[in-house]
Swiss-Prot record:
Gene3D superfamilies: Ribonuclease Inhibitor, Toll/interleukin-1 receptor homology (TIR) domain. Residues 1-25 form the signal peptide. Disulfide bonds join C35-C45, C98-C110, C178-C184, C255-C268, C258-C265, C470-C500, C764-C790, C766-C809. Key component of innate and adaptive immunity. TLRs (Toll-like receptors) control host immune response against pathogens through recognition of molecular patterns specific to microorganisms. TLR9 is a nucleotide-sensing TLR which is activated by unmethylated cytidine-phosphate-guanosine (CpG) dinucleotides. Acts via MYD88 and TRAF6, leading to NF-kappa-B activation, cytokine secretion and the inflammatory response. Upon CpG stimulation, induces B-cell proliferation, activation, survival and antibody production. Keywords: Cell membrane, Cytoplasm, Cytoplasmic vesicle, Disulfide bond, Endoplasmic reticulum, Endosome, Glycoprotein, Immunity, Inflammatory response, Innate immunity, Leucine-rich repeat, Lipoprotein, Lysosome, Membrane, Nucleus, Palmitate, Receptor, Repeat, Signal, Transmembrane, Transmembrane helix. DNA binds at residues 47-51, 72-77, 95-109, 132, 152, 179-181, 208, 262. PROSITE patterns: LRR (PS51450), TIR (PS50104). It is found in: Endoplasmic reticulum membrane; Endosome; Lysosome; Cytoplasmic vesicle. A lipid is attached at C258, C265 (S-palmitoyl cysteine). This is Toll-like receptor 9. It comes from Equus caballus (Horse). GO terms for molecular function: identical protein binding; pattern recognition receptor activity; protein homodimerization activity; siRNA binding; unmethylated CpG binding.
Length: 1031
């Protein structure tokens, strides 16, 4: 049966290929290969390195496609027919296919070609993104277009014909067509009235284009005009004369303060910018005005006259440190909701006090005030007194001000405040209230260095599964990244309504004993991560009766102190605690033997050393057993190598989510999941599992989500997942699977909602079963067309599993064997008759001539052959020369030339002992075809070298054979007259050792030729013909 089976295998493969082809015709394969169909009619072709727009088959539901994204491919040419097949296409994204040279990662120039009817063939198109492409003109566009993005292109001119016919256009973005990353050496030219025909245009953005004036005759329908980061340093009423519908105007960054710039900056000219008093007075509908980074020192109240609807004002990154203490510009802005004054600092100066101007009290609708980066060191009631009368104020940003004294009790006068950010300051503790007078320029000035202006590290966000956010709480105070060493109750006096307090990234090293937070009777969330807390007292945090979330992560220093005990019994005395994080503390010994709580829902214990704790016999075996209501438990990064059933059995039975990511688990007892009857999510990603073979998921388990990604799984036993009937999400990505078998799942396969098998080295052999299976469950496989790729064979490695051509899907080894055999038969069948007909007698004659010649030639060679190809002569007293001869010359000529190896005669190796020196020398000279002289210098030659040279000259006179070859190792030997004469007569017999390693290969080739050919072939015929043999 074996031979028959082998003969029928190609036929079966052809049948399978035909079946797959039929499946393709019936639409079983993903319809938009190589792209992916996503919800709401979006076809995602991003990051596929496509060089042309894919043409989808007629069987695909092309009429359902409303959005096509071709982001970050390599499409340089768009044809008229590329999108014509998509009759209902509304959104098209072609961003970053052919970026200009300045924006390309390798700075390669690129020009995109767009044929005239490419977009006109799509009359339903409404949104088009051509940004980050090397186009120089606006292509022909359909009249249906509503949104057009031409940012970061090479378009440098707009005239009335550029956008003609686009009467429906509402959004036009042309940012960054001429700036430091996309240089052009000029400015974007917008001809007067070029956009006037766009009667419905509401949004226009021309940022980063080197503009020096506001384009003239803009459409009066504009509501959003963004002109930031150009070079417009003068604004007059006529610049915005007809734009009475404007709601948002951004003219920031046109006259920059370069001491705070994060990119190339041009200093603002002296006495600029020049803003006319009535520049904005006619913009009665204006709601947002951006004047950031404009080198403003004063605020003219007339600028804001008539702006009764202004709700957002951005004045950040200016020089308003004096102005904000006495300005009256805010008196008429009763509707203002957001005001940004950040980084209005004096260069290299930190002031002692700051007192806001009384006009701030007129901002009755203000909800958010950003004052970070103004640099004042004291925060008192006087500082924010005008804000106390603002009933709507909710968010106040005061971070990065180098505040070292802060009276936190002043915030009791702000009943509407929901969020106060005092992070990244230098607050070290409570201060007594003091009366402070004087303006911002009063008091002592402290000069700052560049190091002081460096921002601190960002906080590490916590997963909301284990630590809730404060965004929904009514009052939050952020004191993270300050200089707190201890926490005193006086700091929070009169802040009883505080619900969230962040104290992370300080240096708090005290032993909390239940008295530090007494005034905070309403506190629900407390963040003390990244500190040095000493958890010794059993009543820690018990003064917080409403505490629900406590973050004690990254407090590892006390736990690393040998011999010091730690008390976690306070957890049992927090009756409302729901979330607790003890992550990344390195907890390994001398802690409470058990955590107890009836209220705790989520515990993050990642980044500790449970492996060491559970290795201490039964001491910590029941460490988590007392958490009766625990639902979520994170045990990631605990250096666990095994997880015994007794360990799982002592976890809380109420657990629904268990994370064991990034441990060292090479084995997991799946049957022990019955010990956790309520477990719904198990995360084993990033471990060292090699196979899912020891048993299977138990029957009756409640498991719904299983993550075993980033392991090394190469095998899954049949039926492993079949009994877990409630399993809906399975992540098998980033393993070593070569196939995905339907037998793993049984009847469960149809119930899966997510099956991730990406980043596995799947073996894409002909008739691979996993292809049919993945097609059956393709709705559950994320990124099936693009992210599920082949790992073998080599020609398909890294390509989609659908990349192979079904017509070529044959047995590869059999194909090669048949091809080789047929080629050999054809070649022999053609060659033999042809050779016999054309040159049969010649071949017969050459064959017999060769038989007669070979023995005679061998006898003649034996009679005339010499013992050595070359006799090597050198000065043994020079160790460097001797080392070069033995370790370089000998190895190269005798060992590395293979069949062309030369036979060298060396004095110390080949001279016969017992003979005189002259006898050995005579025999060596006359038994060698050539004499190779290796010289370091040619000015002093004596001893054996001189005698050998004289014998070579004698041989020249007697036998008329020039056998001398010179190898000169030192460059100063070129001064020798003999060397220069011999170079002139017989250049190939004088070789110089090259200084550069790149020339050594040529040197050895020249030396081999010099030793194997007669010197008479090397003589310069212009001077002589060389020695000739006597007749």
């Amino acid at each position: 049966m074996g031979p028959c089976h082998g003969a029928l295998q190609p036929l079966s493969l052809l049948v399978q290929a035909a079946m797959l082809a039929v499946a393709l015709a019936q639409g079983t394969l993903p319809p938009f290969l190589p792209c992916e169909l996503q919800p709401h009619g979006l076809v995602n072709c991003n990051w596929l390195f496509l060089k042309s727009v894919p043409h989808f088959s007629a069987a695909a539901p092309r009429d359902n496609v409303t959005s096509l994204s071709l982001l970050s491919n390599r499409i340089h040419h768009l044809h008229d027919s590329d999108f014509a097949q998509l009759s209902n296409l509304q959104k098209l994204n072609l961003k970053w296919n052919c970026p200009p040279a300045g924006l390309s990662p390798m700075h390669f120039p690129c020009h995109m070609t767009i044929e005239p009817n490419t977009f006109l063939a799509v009359p339903t198109l409404e949104e088009l993104n051509l940004s980050y492409n090397g186009i120089t003109t606006v292509p022909a566009l359909p009249s249906s277009l509503v949104s057009l993005i031409l940012s970061r292109t090479n378009i440098l001119q707009l005239d009335p014909t550029s956008l003609t016919g686009l009467h429906a256009l509402r959004f036009l973005y042309m940012d960054g067509n001429c700036y430091y990353k996309n240089p052009c050496g000029r400015a974007l030219e917008v001809a007067p009235g070029a956009l006037l025909g766009l009667g419905n245009l509401t949004h226009l953005s021309l940022k980063y284009n080197n503009l020096t004036t506001v384009p003239r005759s803009l459409p009066p329908s504009l509501e959003y005009l963004l002109l930031s980061y150009n070079h417009i340093v003068t604004l007059a009423p006529e610049d915005l004369a007809n734009l009475t519908a404007l709601r948002v105007l951004d003219v920031g960054g046109n006259c920059r303060r370069c001491d705070h710039a994060r990119n190339p900056c041009v200093e603002c000219p002296h006495k600029f910018p020049q803003l006319h008093s009535d520049t904005f007075s006619h913009l009665s509908r204006l709601e947002g005005l951006v004047l950031k980074d404009s080198s403003l020192y004063q605020l003219n109240p007339r600028w804001f006259r008539g702006l009764g609807n202004l709700t957002v004002l951005d004045l950040s990154e200016n020089f308003l440190y004096d102005c904000i203490t006495k300005t009256k510009a805010f008196q008429g802005l009763a509707q203002l909701r957001r005001l940004n004054l950040s980084f209005n600092y004096h260069k290299k100066v930190s002031f002692a006090h700051l007192t806001l101007a009384p006009s701030f009290g007129s901002l009755l609708s203000l909800q958010e005030l950003d004052m970070h980066g103004i640099f004042f060191r004291s925060l008192s009631q006087k500082t924010l007194q005008p804000l106390a009368r603002l009933p709507m104020l909710q968010r106040l940003y005061l971070q990065m001000n180098f505040i070292n004294q802060a009276q936190l009790g002043i915030f009791k006068d702000f009943p509407g405040l929901r969020y106060i950010d005092l992070s990244d300051n230098r607050i070290s503790g409570a201060v007594e209230p003091v009366a402070t007078t004087g303006e911002v320029d009063g008091g002592k000035k402290v000069w700052l260095t560049s190091r002081d202006l460096t921002p601190g590290p960002l906080d590490t966000p916590s997963s909301e599964d284990f630590m809730p956010s404060c965004k929904n709480l009514s009052f939050t105070l952020d004191l993270s990244r300050n200089n707190l060493v201890t926490v005193q109750p006086e700091m929070f006096a009169q802040l009883s309504r505080l619900q969230c307090l962040r104290l992370s990234h300080n240096s708090i090293s005290q032993a909390v004993n239940g008295s530090q937070f007494v005034p905070l009777t309403s506190l629900q969330v407390l963040d003390l991560s990244h500190n040095k807390l000493d958890l010794y007292h059993g009543r820690s945090f018990t003064e917080l009766p409403r505490l629900e979330a406590l973050d004690l992560s990254y407090n590892s220093q006390p736990f690393s102190m040998r011999g010091v005990g730690h008390n976690l019994s306070f957890v049992a005395q927090l009756p409302t605690l729901r979330y607790l994080s003890l992550a990344h503390n390195g907890i390994h010994s001398r802690v409470s033997q058990q955590l107890c709580s009836t209220s705790l829902w989520a515990l993050d214990f990642s980044g500790n050393s449970l492996s060491q704790m559970w290795a201490e016999g039964d001491l910590y075996l029941r460490f988590f057993q007392g958490l009766r209501s625990l639902i979520r438990l994170d045990l990631s990064q605990n250096r666990l190598h095994t997880l015994l059933p007794c360990t799982l059995g002592n976890l809380p039975k109420s657990l629904q989510l268990l994370r064991l990511r990034n441990n060292y688990l090479a084995f997991f007892n799946w049957s022990s999941l019955t010990l956790l009857p309520n477990l719904e999510t198990l995360d084993l990603a990033g471990n060292q599992l090699k196979a899912l073979s020891n048993g299977s998921l138990p029957s009756g388990t409640q498991l719904q989500r299983l993550d075993v990604s980033r392991n090394s799984i190469i095998f899954v036993v049949p039926g492993f997942f079949a009994l877990a009937t409630r399993l809906r999400e399975l992540n098998l990505s980033a393993n070593a699977l070569r196939t995905v078998e339907p037998s793993w799942f049984g009847f469960l396969a149809g119930s899966l909602e997510v099956l991730d098998v990406s980043a596995n080295p799947l073996h894409c052999a002909c008739g691979a079963a996993f292809v049919d299976f993945l097609l059956q469950v393709q709705a559950a496989v994320p990124g099936l067309p693009s992210r599920v790729k082949c790992g073998s064979p080599g020609q398909l490695q890294g390509r989609s599993i659908f990349a192979q051509d079904l017509r070529l899907c044959l047995d590869e080894s059999l194909s090669w064997d048949c091809f080789g055999l047929s080629l050999l038969v054809v070649a022999l069948g053609l060659a033999m008759p042809m050779l016999h007909h054309l040159c049969g007698w010649d071949l017969w004659y050459c064959f017999h001539l060769g038989l007669a010649w070979l023995p005679r030639r061998g006898w003649q060679r034996g009679a005339d052959a010499l013992s050595y190809d070359a006799f090597v002569v050198f000065d043994k007293a020079q160790s460097a020369v001797a080392d070069w001869v033995y370790n370089e010359l000998r190895v190269r000529l005798e060992e590395r030339r293979g069949r062309r190896a030369l036979r060298l005669c060396l004095e110390e190796r080949d001279w016969l002992p017992g003979k005189t020196l002259f006898e050995n020398l005579w025999a060596s000279v006359y038994s060698s075809r050539k004499m190779l002289f290796v010289l370091a210098h040619t000015d002093q030659v004596s001893g054996l070298l001189r005698a050998s040279f004289l014998l070579a000259q004698q041989r020249l006179l007697e036998d008329r054979k020039d056998v001398v070859v010179l190898v000169i190792l030192s460059p100063d030997a070129r001064r020798s007259r003999y060397v220069r004469l011999r170079q002139r007569l017989c250049r190939q017999s004088v070789l110089f050792w090259p200084h550069q390693p790149s020339g050594q290969r040529s040197f050895w080739a020249q030396l081999g030729m010099a030793l194997t050919r007669d010197n008479r072939h090397f003589y310069n015929q212009n001077f002589c013909r060389g020695p000739t043999m006597a007749e």
